[in-house]
C-alpha cells in the first residue's frame, strides 16, 4: 500500500481570488518582518548563490528595501570583507572609519584606496589621537609617492568636527560654511568617534526606502554551512557586522543543521538566525525549537535545482509554505519562501500562502549587479547562472550544503545544473516591476499590508486549462513586456 499523505500544490496550481477592495496599489504597505528584530521595506531577499549575491547586489537590494545574503563559496576573510563593504557603503555615522598614520607614505595610501574603494581617511597618531584628515583632493596631483600623509593632510587646527549628538542641520551648516564633504565626530578629549560624509546623506535622500540598521548602515546577511569548521566563519561574519546569519543546507530537518543552530544560538543569543531549507511542518518546528529566528522553505523548486528529480524528494512549494506557516503561526517566527518564483504573481501567491518574504535567485541573476561577466551568444547578452548543487559550485565549496563535503571532486553527485540567463539590466528595474505586480495583487484582493495578504487572501485551485488561459495565448508576442518572459 502506498503511504500517500496528501495532495500538494505549487504556484501554477492556484490563483488568488479577487475581493472587495478600498486599497489602491500605490498605497499598499510592502514592509514585512524578516525576523522579530529586522523589518524589510520590501519582501525580497537575494539567494546566497555565487552567481547571484556579492557586494554590489547586496548593496543595491538593501537600498531598495530588501536584504542580500552573501554566498559562502569563498574564503572566510573574503566573505567577511564583503560584509564589511556593504556595512560601510552608506552610514549615518561611520562609527569605525578606516584610519591612517601620519607617517604612512602616499604609495601605501594609494594601495589602501584601491583596497577600500574610497579615498578619505582620518589621520590618528600612535595614541589614537585625531591629528588630521586626508582626502583624494589633497593628493590628486602629487607625483612624489615617497612623501607622507603628514605632508598633505588637513591638520588638527583646521578640522571640522562635531560631537556625536549633533543635529542634521548643524552638520549640514558646517559642511556648507567650510565647503567640506566630511565632518569628523569626536569626543571631549578629541578622540575619533566616527565620520559623517555628505555622500551618505545624499544616498539616504535618494533611497528613502533603504533597509538600514539603527546606525544608518545598510543591512546585509551572509550564509554559512552546517558542517564542522564553520565556527570560525560565523565568528568572522559577526565581527564584520553581519545583520542576519543564514545557516544554509539542502535539508534543514537534519540533526547536523539543528545542532549548528543550537550552538550558534547559545554563543550569540541576540543574533538573528535564518535556517533551512525545509518543506514540512515538522521541519519548521524543529528549526524553531533549535533557535531559528526565521525558517526558509523550499526543497527543489528552483529553476536550476534538480534535487526532486535526482533524489525523488520534495514538496510542491505552495503546500510546503502553507504547512510551515501554519505550524509557526503562534510562535511569531516568519517563513521565507525560497525558490520557484518566476513572476510577480508567484511572489503574491507565496505570501498569501503564509510566507513573510521571498528569496529569489534566477530573478536577480543576470542583472548588472550580479557577479560574472556579460557573455554574448547568438547576438544576445547573457550571464552565467548555476545552482549551488551544480558540480561547478560544489567543487568551489558548497558541497557541504548537500552533505558531500567528504566526497572527492570526481565522486560528487550534483543536485543542480549550470546554465546562462539573459542579461536583465539594473536590479532596481526588476524590483520596480515585481513590487508593482505585488501592489496590484494587494489592490485586487483588498489587502493593505503584507500581513493582511498572508492571512486574508483566498485561493482557488485551477486546472491545466486554467493556467494555459492565464498565460498569453493565441497571439505572437512582437514586443516583450519587462515583467513577462516565457522560457
UniProtKB/Swiss-Prot annotation:
It catalyses: IMP + NAD(+) + H2O = XMP + NADH + H(+). CDD domains: CBS_pair_IMPDH (cd04601), IMPDH (cd00381). Keywords: CBS domain, GMP biosynthesis, Metal-binding, NAD, Oxidoreductase, Potassium, Purine biosynthesis, Repeat. It comes from the Bacteria. Mycophenolic acid (MPA) is a non-competitive inhibitor that prevents formation of the closed enzyme conformation by binding to the same site as the amobile flap. In contrast, mizoribine monophosphate (MZP) is a competitive inhibitor that induces the closed conformation. MPA is a potent inhibitor of mammalian IMPDHs but a poor inhibitor of the bacterial enzymes. MZP is a more potent inhibitor of bacterial IMPDH. InterPro entries: Aldolase_TIM (IPR013785), CBS_dom (IPR000644), CBS_dom_sf (IPR046342), IMP_DH (IPR005990), IMP_DH/GMP_Rdtase_CS (IPR015875), IMP_DH_GMPRt (IPR001093). Residues 93-149, 153-214 form the CBS domain. It is an enzyme of class 1 (oxidoreductase). NAD(+) binds at residues 248-250, 298-300. Catalyzes the conversion of inosine 5'-phosphate (IMP) to xanthosine 5'-phosphate (XMP), the first committed and rate-limiting step in the de novo synthesis of guanine nucleotides, and therefore plays an important role in the regulation of cell growth. HAMAP family: IMPDH. Homotetramer. This is Inosine-5'-monophosphate dehydrogenase.
